[in-house]
Amino acid sequence: MKKHLLALSAAAVLLAPQAVGAEGFSINEWSAEGFAMGGARMFAENDAANMAYNPASLTKIQGEKAKISVAYIAPHGKWKADTDGDDIFDDSGRNRVNPAFAPGMYYVKQLNDKEWIGMGTYARFGNMCQFERDSIVATSAFSSRMNGVSLGLNYARKHDEKWSTSVGAEINYVGLQLDKKPNGMPLHIEGTTYALGWNAAANYAFDDKNEVGVVYRSKVKHSMDGDYDFHTPLASWGGGAYGCVTLPESWSLGYGHKFNDKTRMEFNATWTRWSRFDAFDITFSPLFSNPSAGPMEVPQPKHWNDGWRYAIGIEHELSDKYSVMAGIAHDERGIPDDYADFMVPTGERDTYSLGVQYHDKKQTIALALGYMDVGDLNMKKHAGNMYEKAKMHDSYTKIVVLSYQYNF
């Protein structure tokens, strides 16, 4: 087991820079099966990705299993802007982002009839978007990238035939890159940070057909030390940049029902305290031309709203080797118009997904396809912007997830 844990730890470090999302802050594409069911997969049998969806369900795993997953995320979107305040959108463009990849790796071992241990690395938060560098919306942001990855370790215990619980620790990594042109002058900010979090989960089975579960994930407070470069027509300079941001806590509630030995359904609701993201203030080191001026803080209020995500998924076993899955999910919009910007330009989201799985005694292979319909987002002018108002519209994301699990 130690060999597998060390390998997974090393992989987490190597994969971290690639663990990014698309047009949202929150990522749920942790496995092909989970994505195929809309993220409603808290009670799966013998699935190592339970480490991500519901650690209390590690107790549903027999023996020792390892799983790897990768999600291909291709976002698309258009913008239009009012440049002179006449209520006419007279400039337009599109999200120019390249497709992103969100990997996940999981390892679970049953210690005895009562105890399990699991380890996983996956992306809980992430964002990546790009717009035309010389467009007017570049004054808000023409490139933003938040690479996020979590490395978690959980202990799970089956207390009796009805109760299972789990508790775990998390190391959360965030890498931030932001490029914008406030008042038309290029600014580049880049930094990385690590912080600790924790989680707890519990399942209760009413009988062999009905089960409920709850998962709590703690907030994670990051303090970033980075660097910046700023260019004006008269001079260019750089230095240190510092900022704090708190990634929000969440509660996930799930219900699972087995219609028979071949068909089951899950419902999931997740509440996220997005109001933790109330500001993204950055403090810059003194300018080299006037070091006596002291550090300069640039406030960036966000004031996001708490929100819910609802999902329903169904899984049907076609034979002893093949299963099919389908799901639908709805994410509420947490970004108010007054504080929206092109750093995270996403509205409410509806996701539709399908998947298929092959399984035998030694392995499972799964493929999921999905389409995410992203709602419009209106934006008002903020300090440094050279437009009066703007709007993201006609946004959508295509997603493909592939997973492979090996049973030792």
For each of these PLM feature ranges, what is it?
Residues 1-21:
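Gram-negative bacterial Sec-dependent N-terminal signal peptides
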Residues 20-22, 32-39, 46-47, 53:
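Residue-level signal for pocket-adjacent positions within structured domains
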Residues 23-35, 86-92, 100-408:
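Outer-membrane beta-barrel porins/channels
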